Design a protein with these regions (language model features):
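Short amphipathic alpha-helices in soluble, non-transmembrane regions
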Residues: 125-131, 269-275, 325-326
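C-terminal motif of bacterial Sec signal peptides marking the signal peptidase cleavage site
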Residues: 19-22
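Long, low-complexity, Ser/Thr/Gly/Pro-rich intrinsically disordered segments that act as flexible linkers
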Residues: 27-139, 159-160, 244-250, 299-302, ...
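Short beta-strand-to-loop capping motifs
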Residues: 113-118, 172-173, 256-262, 311-313
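A cross-kingdom marker for long, charged
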Residues: 266, 277-342
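An internal, short helix-loop-strand segment that often contains or flanks glycine-aspartate motifs
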Residues: 64-96, 134-251, 264-265, 269, ...
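Bacterial N-terminal signal peptides that target proteins for export
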Residues: 1-12
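Short, conserved charged micro-motifs
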Residues: 66-68, 119-125, 262-271, 318-320
Length: 342
């Protein structure tokens, strides 16, 4: 190496050393975030606790809305304007796109659980806009984010839980069911069973089978409800009903199940249920719904532990009747103005 080349190399090494010393040690990498917490969100009704339950509805709105023959039926029951009003008031959530919807009524609260793709920030803003008295906000889980916000809406306590972008839960009324639902979602209530997994609804759910719309009520039944269906409700441990599409143009197959210790009285109880169904079909309300003109006449069977009624009805007639009879209630649930009196 020549003296000139050696001097050049020495100067370059000195420059590199100086630059290294000036930069100091490399900054430490940020610590990793908390590991993801597994969420158990399906089926939606597996988040509904059993304690204090009065009734529960399990529905698959998207599956219903995807049946072409049912689109005009839905339009009669719930006009497009009401779907739009609900979406505008709830952060863009379209009821018809909800994969699973569970509504559970308790003595002093109501729980609505929707499993659907959503924008959590938008849904949270919509809740804040509806609230007439702000409460608070908590991030219960960081990864994935489980956010809880609460407040009052026109004097009613309400609480919203957002499970990432996958599901939302709304509690209305006295606090309690939402906490249990969150614990189910986080897998913290291993010794407890959700409403449809424990007695007495697990048995009636198994007999009823799967359907896009199902409704359940646990016994014992007292007061006016005990006199329902020819007095059979008093002896029932649970009652459930389902509805499903049964073919064009808009046939709806309905199944009704009453569980109880019917034993040797099953045949007589089945005859009593058939008579009660006939009385209902011939009543003003039954005629309004068109159940006095079934597509397939009701068939009632009985066994030691269950009474089962199956029939098929005209879905268009059912929708028209329900629209006329329950218009105010649908307005309360979906939102939007009620129709003008006729």
């Amino acid at each position: 190496m020549t003296p000139r080349a050696g001097a050049t190399a020495l100067a370059l090494a000195a420059a590199l050393l100086s630059a290294t010393e000036g930069c100091g040690p490399r900054p430490a990498a940020p610590p990793p975030g908390p590991p993801p917490v597994p969420l158990h969100l399906a089926p939606a009704c597996d988040l509904a606790p059993a304690a204090g339950l009065e009734w529960i509805i399990d529905a698959r709105p998207r599956a219903i809305a995807e049946v072409p023959d049912l689109i005009p039926v839905l339009a009669v029951l719930v006009p497009e304007a009401r779907f739009a009003a609900f979406a505008a008031a709830h952060g863009g959530v379209d009821v018809r796109q909800i994969a699973e919807l569970c509504v559970a009524k308790y003595k002093e609260a109501r729980l609505t659980i929707a499993r659907t793709a959503l924008d959590p920030a938008r849904v949270e803003r919509a809740f804040a806009d509806r609230a007439t008295h702000a409460g608070g906000r908590s991030i219960d889980v960081v990864n994935p984010p489980v956010v809880r916000v609460w407040g009052e809406v026109h004097g009613e306590a309400q609480q919203l839980l957002l499970f990432g972008r996958e599901a939302a839960l709304l509690e209305q009324g006295r606090a309690g069911p939402a906490r249990a639902a969150e614990a189910f979602a986080l897998g913290k209530l291993r010794r407890a069973s959700p409403a449809l997994r424990g007695s007495p609804l697990s048995n009636v759910a198994e007999i009823l089978g799967e359907a896009p719309v199902r409704a359940f009520a646990p016994g014992p039944f007292e007061g006016d409800s005990a006199h329902g269906l020819g007095g059979l409700m008093r002896a029932s441990s649970a009652v459930a009903a389902s509805a499903r599409f049964a073919g064009p143009p808009a046939k709806i197959a309905v199944r009704l199940v009453l569980t109880g210790a019917w034993g040797k009285s099953a045949h007589a109880a089945a005859s009593r249920l058939a008579a009660a169904v006939h009385v209902l079909s011939e009543s003003p309300f039954g005629r309004l719904l068109g159940v006095d003109r079934p597509v397939v006449a009701p068939l009632v069977t009985g066994s030691d532990d269950a009474l089962v009624m199956e029939a098929t009805f005209d879905g268009a007639a059912l929708a028209r009747g329900l629209h006329d009879a329950l218009d105010a209630e649908v307005t309360d649930i979906i939102g939007g103005p009620a129709r003008a009196p006729r």
